[in-house]
């Protein structure tokens, strides 16, 4: 009865350990982040080796139990009195049952190992694919980082050019303001020159009118002077003729 309890406890421990292995394998096969994908193959192999060691220890302990039972049964057979030989069949039956239980436990263990191997064989391609995708994403990330650096350099260059353009614009604004100021002064001077020109034109017109009046006055004086000269010439001629006649009349 004690042996059956030991076998039941061993089988229960084996089932619990197998469930733990399956749970750990399922936890390992769950989706992980990008930073953990590269560690999945090593992690899975590590878990598999650790679980394999656990199963080996469990199998060793079970073999020790079986060895102990076989040794105990052999000692019991050798130490039995002739009166106890009647229960030999019952002991053999117990041993047979124990061996059958051991075979069942071993078969269950091997089934669980096969399940784990199958799960690992299915998970490894997924891990490789995840690792490949991680590598591609890493390359894409590096390319994006390179493009980001190029864009940042272009942005800095554009900012510098914008600052230079702003300075040039400020200089052009100052130059434009100076040109407008000078143009305004030139226009003011031009307006003053126009006004002076109009004044000079008016003065020239007035002077021309004075000159015309003076010319008319001079022409009038000249004509009057000519008339006086002619009149004086005629008078002198008359005087000369009169004197000549007087002289003739006085001569004998």
Curated annotation (Swiss-Prot):
It is found in: Nucleus; Chromosome, Centromere, Kinetochore. The modification Phosphoserine is found at residues 216, 249. The keyword Coiled coil applies. Pfam families: Zwint. GO terms for biological process: cell division; homologous chromosome orientation in meiotic metaphase I; regulation of meiosis I spindle assembly checkpoint. Transmembrane segments: none annotated. Residues 120-221 form a coiled coil. Its main location: nucleus. Residues 89-99 have a biased composition (Basic and acidic residues). GO terms for cellular component: dendrite; kinetochore; Knl1/Spc105 complex; nucleus. Keywords: Cell cycle, Cell division, Centromere, Chromosome, Coiled coil, Kinetochore, Mitosis, Nucleus, Phosphoprotein. Residues 80-99 are annotated as: Disordered. It comes from the Eukaryota. InterPro entries: Zwint-1 (IPR029092). Acts as a component of the outer kinetochore KNL1 complex that serves as a docking point for spindle assembly checkpoint components and mediates microtubule-kinetochore interactions. Kinetochores, consisting of a centromere-associated inner segment and a microtubule-contacting outer segment, play a crucial role in chromosome segregation by mediating the physical connection between centromeric DNA and spindle microtubules. Component of the KNL1 complex composed of KNL1 and ZWINT. Part of the ten-subunit outer kinetochore KMN network that includes the KNL1, MIS12 and NDC80 complexes; a bioriented kinetochore contains approximately 150 copies of the network. Interacts with the MIS12 complex subunits MIS12 DSN1, and PMF1. Interacts with the NDC80 complex subunit NDC80 during mitosis. Interacts with ZW10. Interacts with CETN3. This is Outer kinetochore KNL1 complex subunit ZWINT. It comes from Mus musculus.
């Amino acid at each position: 009865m004690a042996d059956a309890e030991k076998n039941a406890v061993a089988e229960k421990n084996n089932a619990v350990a197998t469930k733990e292995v399956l749970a750990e394998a399922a936890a390992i096969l769950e989706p992980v982040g990008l930073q953990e994908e590269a560690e999945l193959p090593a992690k899975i192999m590590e878990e598999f080796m650790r679980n394999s060691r656990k199963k080996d220890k469990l199998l060793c302990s079970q073999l020790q139990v079986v060895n102990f039972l076989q040794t105990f049964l052999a000692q019991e057979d050798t130490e039995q009195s002739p009166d106890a030989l009647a229960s030999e069949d019952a002991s053999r039956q117990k041993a047979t049952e124990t061996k059958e239980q051991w075979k069942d436990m071993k078969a269950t263990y091997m089934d669980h190992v096969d399940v784990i191997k199958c799960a690992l064989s299915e998970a490894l391609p997924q891990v490789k694919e995840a690792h490949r995708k991680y590598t591609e994403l890493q390359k894409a990330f590096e390319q994006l980082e390179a493009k980001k650096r190029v864009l940042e350099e272009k942005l800095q260059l554009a900012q510098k050019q914008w600052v230079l353009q702003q300075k040039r614009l400020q200089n052009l604004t100052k130059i434009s303001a100076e040109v407008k100021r000078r143009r305004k002064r030139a226009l003011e001077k031009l307006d003053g020159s126009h006004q002076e020109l109009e004044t000079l034109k008016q003065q020239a017109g007035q002077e021309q009118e004075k000159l015309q009046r003076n010319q008319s006055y001079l022409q009038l004086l000249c004509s009057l002077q000519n008339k006086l000269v002619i009149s004086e010439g005629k008078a002198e001629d008359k005087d000369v003729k009169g004197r000549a006649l007087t002289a003739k009349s006085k001569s004998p």
